[in-house]
Structures are given as C-alpha cells and as structure tokens.
C-alpha cells in the first residue's frame, strides 16, 4: 500500500524507535529476576526512544513543534504544526515484560489532528490514519464495531495510578459499566485501547486524567475508522480536558449517558 510522504515519515521514525524498544524489552525480561529490577533501565529506554523520534521527525519536518512525554514542549518556527508523541505508552506493562505497549505519534495542525500512528513493536501491529483518508491496521482498512446492544459489548477503561486521580469515582464508574456490558477490560495502554476500538476489537473505551500524548494519535485513528471521540461530557475536547470516551455512535452515546452524571 502506498502512503503519503507524511505517513512515510511517521512510519520510518516509529519503526526505528520500535526496534530499540524491542531490544530493550528483551533486557527488561532478564532484569525481572534481578534485585535491582528494570525500573531505571526502562526510564532510559523511554527517553532514548523519544530522542530518536524527535531526531527523525524534526529532521523530516524542520520547524515543527514537538510535545513529548519525557522532554515536554519544544517550540518550532512553524507554529501551526506540532508533533504530539508518547515514545512508550504502557510503561508499566513494558516494565513487567508484558508486550502490550506502543509508540504513539500524532500531528496537529492549527489545533486539529491531521495524522496519527500507533505502533506496537512487540507484534508489529501498525495503526495509521490521515484526515479524510481512513484508518488502517497493517494496510487493512479499519471500521469500528457495529454493535448496538451494550449487553453484547466489551468495553475498556483506565485506572488511576497510586496517588493520582479519583479512585472512588473510578470504582463507581467501573461498577456502573460492568453491570451493563458483556465484559470490562483494563489493558494499561491508552493508545492501544483506542486502536482496538478503531479495529473493532473493543466496542468502547473511557478514561480520565489522560495527557495529550496518550490520545492524540488514537483520536484521529478512531474517527477515521468511523468512531466518535469526545470528553466524558460528550461534547468537550479530550485533548483539553484529559477525559475521553470513544466508540461507535451508539456505544459512545450510551457511555456518555452513564458516565457524565457520575462525575458531577
């Protein structure tokens, strides 16, 4: 499949950083049994991957801004374009040698996401989307699942880390959703949860207190697969609020109906 020059830039950068992370994953697995543990090693792997992505993306598109999880915001001469990057989404999974992690690259133009990529180096799954051109997994066109009965749906969520977020609210939300769906899952990588919604593997996903790099790429991939993405209020911008719901039109509306009142 032929890609645009922009997508080719993103794919090339992601694959190079992905090779580094895959090598590092092997070392992480070895460190599981050591007294020192892999935490410091994973921190360095995360930073190394971000620098590789920054180098490749800015070399290809000089002047673009860059927002990364590790390095923060780096201003560019071109104020209208900004890369939004998570070099290692699912860090805790990676830390434990669980192959559910991803590189996430989104490109924003004047406040609108125009391209997104999510890449899992562990299994080589590559999700891409460009505004108006559809979403793809390994060159296969994606569509969100079409289920319209919540009782048949599998929904994913995120959980707040220790010392962060509202744990009581999280438990309440999970209880309310679990009572209505076929299954509730927590995989630990927001970008991949969104990619799974885009591919129809999951019917919906919600999470609070996300950062822009967690969901920038996933947002456009879900939308280009025919899904709806919003904040938990239903009409707000998740990149600004940090709270996100996505799914097909029916599932999205049902999740908003259930979750919106709980956060009041």
Question: Each PLM stretch: what is its role?
Answer:
Residues 21, 46, 57, 91, ...:
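Residue-level signal for inorganic ion chemistry
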Residues 34, 75-77, 110, 128, ...:
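Solvent-exposed alpha-helices and their adjacent loops that cap or buttress functional pockets
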Residues 47, 51, 70, 87-90, ...:
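Generic detector of well-ordered alpha-helical packing
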Residues 1-88, 228, 250, 257-260, ...:
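N-terminal subdomain of lithium-sensitive/metallo-dependent phosphomonoesterases centered on the IMPase/IPPase/PAP
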Residues 143-264:
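An extended, acidic
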Residues 77-136:
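DPxDG-like acidic metal-binding loop motif
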